Amino acid sequence: MYDVAIIGAGINGCSVAYEFMKEGKRVILFDKEGIASGGSGAAGAFISPKFSKAGELKELLHEAFVYSCDFYEKNFPLCFAKATLTHIAKDEADDEALRVYKQKTTLKLKKIPKNLEQLLTREAKKRENISLEAGIIDAKQVCNDMSCGAQFVKEKVERLIFNDDCWVINETYSAKNVVLATGAYDMPIVEPYIQIRAIWGHRIDITTTTKNPSSVHQYVSLSPSNDGILAIGATHNVHYHPEKTKESYDIEQGRVELLKKATRTMHLKNVNVVQDYTGLRSGSFDYLPMVGSLVLSNETLLTCKDSLYVKKPDFAEYVYYPNLTMINGSGGYGFVLAPYLAKILTEYILHDKEINKTINPARFFARWAKKR
């Protein structure tokens, strides 16, 4: 019997595994492909806040950015490379958002590095920019290191049954708790109010004689040069899904688009693409992550008829699956949010610490129930 079974071995699942093992718990981790085999493995894994004027997501990402930079540096220093991050506005609206951000942020800002400024295009130099200390994660390595100590099973979870106070997985394994960290792929438990946006990501590694000193974000993300290699990545095709789209993804066209966008920001010389990484990321429809217990929709519709249409529903009145939670929907901020959200989820499961309503999956049940 395991204390927790985690379904999905991307950065979310591996972060939860790490938190549970830190508490001395027995962990089993499932993934049909392998550790960091999907969107997490394809990620550029840039650690960045959200540069916007205001909003719940901006505030959440600010807290997660501060927490995760410290978390990676302390716990996985060999996977974390500190680097200056320079974010450049795309248009006039972005210019204004960055000006407001710079006035209000509590983060320590830096001047744009001189050796970076020399590489920027005329168009990029005209736009507002912001620079601060951030970092880049070795995506696959940190997922492997985080999950070290967990029992890993390369298997698709198709059957999940609650029986005698525990969950039975694929009729073979049992666990007291189950955490669904399935990303953009189908969950073994189907609930109509849980809808995931699948977001295709593409990253390329290139060789170039251009030496980039910083992480640079504008139309795409560019990593600092490392032994002549520079990574370029983006949330590239929001409609493509490898299991649901008939046509295969056009890698060559993806490369062309990434390089075209990158060269709008920076002069890149003698470019040669040496490797491609692709994978699905998952987002929610209100852009905030989903962390917490899953509502049993049919049972809740029957028992909470009178309270389904109130302006501010009380999530505590809903009926939930026993010992079943999820962590999902981080979009392009997976490596920023995962350590922070995994800690929140673990404290909820093991110590009954309340989860903020803004990220609780029950918010989607409340909206769905009203629209039925």
Task: Pin down the residues of each PLM region.
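N-terminal Rossmann-like FAD-binding beta1-loop-alpha1 element of flavoenzymes
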Residues: 2-28
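Glycine-rich FAD pyrophosphate-binding loop
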Residues: 22-41
